[in-house]
Regions:
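Structured catalytic-domain cores with a bias toward divalent-metal coordination
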Residues: 1-104
Length: 104
């Protein structure tokens, strides 16, 4: 679903970012695997790294990996780029020979 402006791709917080990513991946009508890695922490027991795997539709020749950032402010920009990629670019990709792995 295309956002009304590019600004709308930026999440307000971690939870919104996570929910938007998972919902957008779920909406894609293609073969996929959506997963998560739990991140243990002293104070926060609700941290996860979500990931989505889209296998090539035919023979694998290329792998494209897109990450959102490791920590701090770059994660918001990275999450916005991922949402724009999923909603606007992904549907236009010829996926016959490319696997796509997105680490959110």
């Amino acid at each position: 679903m295309k956002q009304s402006s590019d600004h709308d791709y930026f999440p307000q917080n971690y939870q919104q970012s996570r929910e938007s990513f998972r919902a957008s991946v779920d909406l894609l009508k293609t073969q996929k695997s959506l997963g998560q890695w739990a991140i243990p922490g002293k104070n926060d027991h609700d941290l996860f790294v979500d990931h989505a795997w889209f296998p090539p539709l035919e023979k694998a020749e290329t792998l494209f990996v897109l990450t959102s950032g490791i920590h701090g402010s770059e994660t918001y920009a990275g999450a916005a780029i991922q949402m724009m990629f999923i909603n606007e670019i992904f549907p236009k990709i010829d996926r016959r020979h490319i696997g796509i792995f997105i680490v959110h």
